[in-house]
């Protein structure tokens, strides 16, 4: 647990979240946050009863983590894994400087599209110039960090939120554009239509500063409902990056989770 957060209000009651994790570094952090959310917002109790306690998902932070997410955008799980395996193995070490210096045609032969090459080289140049610092990013609040990432060429809201949540473990990152979370919220809150990314922002306000934990809960609900009811089996699949993220052990040990 890296810090504490200010008090947060909800329409029903005042919940003291001073001891809640700002970052979800361990399974214990996530469990503490989920229990606080369920207590704070009674609407989440039936969601938790269906989903159960979700497992913390983390992956490597820094340039490698962001590069893996970008490489896997809009691809099947198998294709994304194969391309990332080739890209990461082609450089020793794999870092922003190595990729920045690599020829575009070499990267293309590894399976990266021209758009993804441009995005990754752009990020690498920002890091080399000192205009982007992942250590600083890790300590910014979720909205500020999201803005920093989406100001980079080719980094959209979904990519930024997934990086903040799974690579940095940011407890308040909210993937408003994720289709699975949108569909789960629609079903769980009894909405008539699936909310848009813009509509998801106010829906998540009661869950600040633990929106990242809420996202874990909604993903768990999505998986449970899809398996149990089949009601969302025909919906678009969430980005394949999520499907291959390592799952933290269910132990309540205090050791940090490594991606």
Question: What label would you give each PLM region?
Answer:
Residues 59-74:
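Alpha-helical scaffold segments that form or flank carboxylate-/histidine-based iron centers
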Residues 74, 78-87:
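Conserved alpha-helical segments that form or flank metal/cofactor-binding pockets of metalloenzymes
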Residues 31, 61-65, 101, 143-146:
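Alpha-helical scaffolds flanking conserved acidic
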Residues 2, 9-62, 223-259:
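Intrinsically disordered, low-complexity, charged terminal extensions of DNA damage-control enzymes
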Residues 87-259:
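Catalytic cores of DNA base-excision repair glycosylases
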Residues 41, 45, 64, 68, ...:
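Short amphipathic alpha-helical segments
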């Amino acid at each position: 647990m890296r810090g504490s957060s200010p008090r947060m209000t909800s329409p029903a009651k005042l919940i003291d979240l001073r001891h809640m994790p700002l970052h979800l570094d361990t399974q214990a952090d996530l469990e503490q946050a989920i229990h606080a959310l369920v207590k704070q917002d009674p609407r989440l109790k039936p969601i938790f009863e269906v989903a159960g306690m979700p497992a913390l998902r983390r992956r490597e932070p820094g340039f490698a983590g962001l590069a893996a997410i970008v490489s896997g955008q809009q691809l099947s799980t198998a294709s994304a894994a194969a391309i990332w395996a080739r890209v990461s193995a082609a450089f020793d070490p794999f870092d922003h400087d190595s990729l920045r210096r690599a020829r575009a045609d070499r990267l293309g032969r590894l399976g990266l599209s021209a758009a993804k090459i441009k995005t990754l080289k752009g990020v690498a140049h920002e890091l080399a110039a000192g205009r982007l610092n992942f250590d600083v990013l890790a300590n910014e609040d979720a909205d500020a960090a999201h803005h920093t990432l989406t100001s980079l060429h080719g980094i959209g809201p979904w990519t930024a939120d997934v990086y903040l949540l799974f690579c940095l473990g940011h407890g308040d990152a909210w993937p408003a554009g994720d289709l699975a979370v949108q569909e789960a919220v629609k079903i769980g809150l009894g909405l008539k239509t699936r909310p848009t990314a813009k509509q998801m922002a106010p829906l998540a306000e009661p869950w600040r500063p633990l929106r990242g934990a809420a996202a874990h809960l909604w993903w768990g609900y999505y998986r449970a409902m899809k398996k149990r009811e089949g009601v969302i089996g025909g919906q678009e699949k969430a980005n394949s990056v999520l499907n291959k993220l390592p799952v933290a052990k269910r132990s309540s040990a205090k050791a940090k989770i490594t991606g």
